Amino acid sequence: PTVSLVLGGGHSIGIPLAVSAQKSFIAPSASMMIHPVRTCGVVVGSPVTYHYFQRIQEQITDFVTENSHISREKFTEYMMATGQIATDVGTIVYGKEAVESGLIDRLGGLHDALETLHRMIEKQHKTGGGNKTHKNYRNLRSGML
């Protein structure tokens, strides 16, 4: 079982990391910056370079939309928005909006994330899976880990 929690800022590659868990949480005051793939410094402006970045962006978009409940259209809209970030494109979303858009599963904090993880472990144990996980869970609950 996996649970993620965004407490401060889940920017850039933090978004795919957050949605990769089975359940994701975000604190109400936490933010996430959604923007397209880009680079800094000197880049040769060739069609090959452009195509490379386009392929990377497609992979990231596919991963995020397949591992969350946000639509491809909404994610792309956030990513390509102008007017929010002074010198760039993208969108900053905060806790409630991240949940309402389907990017993150629930609002919550550390307690909520740990309680959910504990319930997931218990459920896995009851269905016969993960004996080693359950032993580690019992040790964690009793303060041995």
Would you name each region that the model predicts?
Residues 1-15, 20-145:
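N-terminal organellar transit peptides
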